[in-house]
C-alpha cells in the first residue's frame, strides 16, 4: 500500500485521468473529491461490496432459476 501525506487543497493523481483532492479535515473525518472519467466507477468500499454481493446473488439466483426452467 502506498501511503501519502496531503494537506487540504492538495491533490494526488491516479494514472493520467483520476485526481483525488483533500477537501477538508474535521476531527477524524477527511472529505475528499474524486475527479474521474464517466467510465471509471468510484464507490465507497461498503457500497462497492454491496454491489458485488448483489451481482453475485443475482447471478446465483439467475443460474438456479434457469436450471429450474430446464426441468
Swiss-Prot record:
Gene3D superfamilies xrefs: Translational regulator CsrA
Chain's role: A key translational regulator that binds mRNA to regulate translation initiation and/or mRNA stability. Mediates global changes in gene expression, shifting from rapid growth to stress survival by linking envelope stress, the stringent response and the catabolite repression systems. Usually binds in the 5'-UTR; binding at or near the Shine-Dalgarno sequence prevents ribosome-binding, repressing translation, binding elsewhere in the 5'-UTR can activate translation and/or stabilize the mRNA. Its function is antagonized by small RNA(s).
Primary location group: cytoplasm
Name of protein: Translational regulator CsrA
Family from the record: Belongs to the CsrA/RsmA family.
Cellular component, GO annotation: cytosol
One of the record's GO molecular function terms: mRNA 5'-UTR binding
Family annotation (Pfam families): CsrA (PF02599)
BP term (GO), one: mRNA catabolic process
Subunit structure: Homodimer; the beta-strands of each monomer intercalate to form a hydrophobic core, while the alpha-helices form wings that extend away from the core.
Species name: Pseudoalteromonas atlantica (strain T6c / ATCC BAA-1087)
Protein encoded by which gene: csrA
Superkingdom classification of source: Bacteria
Alphabetic keyword roster: Activator, Cytoplasm, Repressor, RNA-binding, Translation regulation
Subcellular location per the Swiss-Prot or TrEMBL entry: Cytoplasm
NCBIfam families: csrA (TIGR00202), PRK01712.1 (NF002469)
